[in-house]
Amino acid sequence: MPVIKVRDNEPFEVALRRFKRSCEKAGILSEVRRREFYEKPTTERKRAKASAVKRYTKKLARENARRNRLY
């Protein structure tokens, strides 16, 4: 859990914004959304594999775009 210290004469809104930003960097909200409902291990593996394939295709597309720009 991210902890922030409220500075002297710091408005509440600014402290809240800093706390939200630290939570976002720590990945707490995405973790909570991921754990909200039970996910079967097969579904979890399927989702992980699909994201790996998506990353790979994006990487290939970037490399192809770079290669096409060079010539």
UniProtKB/Swiss-Prot annotation:
Q: Does the keyword Oxidoreductase apply?
A: no
Question: Which Gene3D superfamilies is this protein grouped with?
Answer: Ribosomal protein S8 (1.20.5.1150)
Cross-referenced Pfam families = Ribosomal_S21 (PF01165)
Gene Ontology MF: a single term: structural constituent of ribosome
Q: Which domain of life is it from?
A: Bacteria
Q: Which UniProt keywords apply?
A: Ribonucleoprotein, Ribosomal protein
> Does this UniProt record's set of keywords contain Ribosomal protein?
yes
The protein's matches in InterPro entries, at most eight in alphabetical order, are given as:
Ribosomal_bS21 (IPR001911), Ribosomal_bS21_CS (IPR018278), Ribosomal_bS21_sf (IPR038380)
Which HAMAP family has this protein been placed in? Ribosomal_bS21 (MF_00358)
The record's family statement is: Belongs to the bacterial ribosomal protein bS21 family.
- What this protein is called in its record is Small ribosomal subunit protein bS21
- Tell me the organism: Baumannia cicadellinicola subsp. Homalodisca coagulata
Taxon lineage: Bacteria, Pseudomonadati, Pseudomonadota, Gammaproteobacteria, Candidatus Palibaumannia
